[in-house]
Amino acid sequence: MTPRRRGIIIRMKMNRSKQFFLSLAWLVSVHALMLVVLTVFRLVELTCLHGMITDHGASVVTAFVKGVWFDNVVACYISVLPLAVTLLAAAFGYAGKKLRKGVCYWYFVFSAIVFMASAANTPYFEYFFKNINSSIFEWFGYAATTAGMVFQEKSYILHIFLYFVFLAAYIVAMIYMRRYFDRRIDRCRRDDRFVLPVALRFIVSVCVVLLCLFGIRGRMGYNPIKISQAYYCDDPFLN
């Protein structure tokens, strides 16, 4: 093998290594962004319903920590498939823009659903004094009536407005993040100096996916996370 050919092969390996870690950094950033938006929805709920707190000795910080814990379970459900596909593709040398665009659409669709539930939880809790749950699917048989009730109730307008504002901000942030990492990945051909073999990239991919699956499980105990894990005080709102 000539020195020139050897140098070309080394540069290709360098490029793929940095593409892999940039792809991982992008996915972690997207996952973290989702958790930030969900936390903002919780802040809105606390601001709107803080008068419903009955146990004033209970820690609000603990409530938020447990909230992020449960939000991370939901986020991991959404992230596990794009994480596996993107990292395994990058491990074997593919980190194209089309793949990241497809992943963005995946997050847009499922995040919109999750954010909708988070936005609806505030008026739902105010009315029923409990968090939103699967019982809302019973309303789908009365879709027209339910929609009329929601949009005619003026107190819901704020939450509908905030939903679209936060969703739009999330989408814009996702687009800017994707473009930023697109540029970084395109430039990595010229400045990468770290080489990681395909086998090691594959192992790292598997470990990260397993970590995401652990996030879905939510805990290290015999049983996965349950709703009862949220209860830490006598206040229904903080729980």
Residue ranges and their predicted role:
Residues F41-D71, W106-Y163, R184-R189, R217-L238:
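Membrane-interfacial interhelical loops
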Residues V28-L46:
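N-terminal-proximal low-complexity accessory segments that begin disordered
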Residues V36, R201-G215:
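Hydrophobic membrane-insertion alpha-helices, especially the h-region
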Residues M1-K13:
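Short, Lys/Arg-enriched N-terminal segments with co-localized hydrophobic residues
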Residues V73-T86, F161-Y176:
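Hydrophobic cores of alpha-helical transmembrane segments in multi-pass inner/ER membrane proteins
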Residues W69, V73-L88, K97-Y107:
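N-terminal helix-rich structural modules
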Residues K18-L33, K98-S111, P197-F202:
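Alpha-helical transmembrane segments and their helix-start/interface "positive-inside/aromatic belt" motifs
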Residues F92-Y94, V165-V204:
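Cytosolic-side transmembrane helix boundary signature
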